């Protein structure tokens, strides 16, 4: 059977296809039970990731001091509606790059939500002018849904760089979009 990646996040087989191997086992050997990841009880999850209402906070445990900060409102940059967003610059020279990370749906700016929609497995790569202690993002809420990204998202800090991935590992769907409106970088000093 041919495996097709439908809509960038749903693996399917072609119609009439037959599955001939499960977990590396074939014809009667039995594939056993695949490992299933545990689901978090609360939306606040992952090391360095906290979700509270429409606020997503990314914290660097290795940064113990607090310095200056810079804030960016994505709605004030003159970005084109429904257009892909790549790199935007903060007033102090720090940047955030919105990366599709190989996914069919990449980050786009929408005027009606006043921010950038970040889809499943997309990345945000922050490059600070100094070591980053924390990143605070305010996000959109619509019809009772807080668009704060997936609870399984990851954050990785490395000196002046931080990489957020809106990780989604389920076989169907795309999880929760991150609809980021403002971003505040707090530096360590």
Regions found by a protein language model. Name each.
Residues 140-158:
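Short, surface-exposed beta-strand/strand-loop-strand elements in extracellular ectodomains
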Residues 22-27, 182-189:
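Short beta-strand-to-coil "C-cap" segments at the C-terminal boundary of structured domains/repeats
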Residues 130-143:
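A short beta-strand element within beta-rich, extracytoplasmic domains
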């Amino acid at each position: 059977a041919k495996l097709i990646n439908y809509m960038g996040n749903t693996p399917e087989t072609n119609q009439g296809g037959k599955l001939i191997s499960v977990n590396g086992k074939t014809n009667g050997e039995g594939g056993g039970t695949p490992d299933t990841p545990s689901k978090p009880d609360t939306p606040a999850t992952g090391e360095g990731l906290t979700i509270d209402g429409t606020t997503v906070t990314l914290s660097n445990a290795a940064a113990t001091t607090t310095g200056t900060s810079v804030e960016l409102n994505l709605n004030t940059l003159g970005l084109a509606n429904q257009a892909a967003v790549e790199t935007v610059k903060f007033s102090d020279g720090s940047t955030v790059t919105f990366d599709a990370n190989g996914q069919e749906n990449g980050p786009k700016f929408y005027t009606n939500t006043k921010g950038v929609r970040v889809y499943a497995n997309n990345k945000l790569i922050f490059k600070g002018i100094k070591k980053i202690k924390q990143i605070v993002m305010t996000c959109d809420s619509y019809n009772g849904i807080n668009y704060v990204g997936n609870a399984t998202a990851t954050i990785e800090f490395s000196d002046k760089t931080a990489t957020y991935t809106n990780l989604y590992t389920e076989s169907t769907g795309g999880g929760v979009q991150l609809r980021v409106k403002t971003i505040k970088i707090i530096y360590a000093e």
